[in-house]
A protein has these predicted regions:
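Hydrophobic alpha-helical transmembrane segments
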Residues: 1-18, 154-161, 274-297
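Functional transmembrane core segments of multi-pass inner-membrane proteins
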Residues: 105-108, 112-113, 117-230, 234, ...
Length: 297
């Protein structure tokens, strides 16, 4: 393995990312609907015929079928290969960033910490996709992402060069526990649910990967991103609500859907955590130094 060049492993990580992206398509569709991820097997949604495994190959399957199902020739959304390609690129980016970027793709990947960082970035980048998609639309974060993230963080800490297993365990407990306590207090003060338990488990996973400091930095950056997005979003929602009150007519079904997906005009917090985490994992120390230098001169 020591003699295999970086470009080869980038292709491997692209393929792994595309496979994960294909599985995420299943998660995004099935979990919010309460459908098992295993049964029934992949099948055509129209005629219910089982899809052979060779047609399920990420990206290749869609190209092979020319964007139409083999059984009843119905169009297959291009979103599927686009999502798989994006996840493939994110998978390759995970290893590329862990190896220090650079232009020499012929160098071998030797250091154990490089593989540990690549595994961490792989989960951070690939996990962001279903968190953003599912949490925004359905206001839930799959346990297959948050809980697996905690386990992955604890296992990665066993590789020398990163945080220690104790730091990883403390990061998971203190980050998750701290956010749970913060949400509990906010719920009591505001007299309504202020924090979902999915966010708690997600931050616990980030704590397991980055330690307490990294998780706290991620939480702060996510909160700032949330403010930057929610302020203009809230203004737009209020303006739209005023327009409706002045005579705009919407169907009851549309109103019910709006209420379900955008309750109280709010966007779930999970996507902001998922975006902030890989940024802080890569550049947290540098960004913190810039902030300190800017504030304190």
């Amino acid at each position: 393995m020591q003699e295999i060049p970086l470009w080869y492993w980038l292709i491997v990580f692209f393929g792994l990312g595309a496979c994960v992206g294909s599985f995420y398509n299943v998660i995004v569709y099935r979990m919010p609907r309460g459908i098992s991820l295993i049964n029934p097997p992949s099948h055509c949604p129209l005629c219910k015929k089982r899809i052979p495994i060779y047609y399920n190959l990420p990206i290749v399957g869609w190209l092979w079928l020319r964007g139409k199902s083999a059984c009843c020739k119905q169009p297959i959304s291009i979103i599927y290969p686009i999502g798989e390609s994006l996840c493939g690129l994110l998978g390759a980016l995970a290893l590329y960033s862990a190896s220090g970027f650079g232009t020499d793709l012929t160098r071998p990947v030797l250091a154990p910490e490089t593989w540990a960082n690549a595994a961490a970035m792989f989960w951070l980048l690939l996990g962001a996709y279903p968190v953003c998609a599912v949490d925004y639309k359905y206001k839930l974060i799959p346990d297959s992402i948050s809980v697996v993230g905690i386990v992955a963080g604890l296992l990665i800490s066993l590789v020398p060069g990163g945080i220690t297993p104790l730091q990883s365990l403390l990061g998971a407990v203190l980050a998750g526990g701290g956010l749970y306590l913060l949400g509990w207090v906010a719920t009591k003060v505001l007299k309504k649910d202020a924090m979902g338990f999915g966010d708690v488990k997600l931050l616990a996973g980030y704590g397991a990967l980055m330690g307490v400091t990294g998780a706290v930095e991620t939480l702060l950056v996510a909160a700032m991103l949330g403010v930057l997005v929610m302020v203009p979003y809230g203004m737009i929602k209020n303006k739209a609500a005023s327009a409706k009150a002045n005579g705009a007519v919407n169907s009851a079904a549309k109103n019910e859907n709006d209420s379900e997906n955008e309750e109280n005009g709010q966007i779930p917090f999970g996507p902001f955590l998922a975006i902030a985490a890989p940024v802080m994992y890569l550049w947290g120390d540098a960004l913190f130094s810039l902030y300190v230098n800017y504030v304190f001169g």
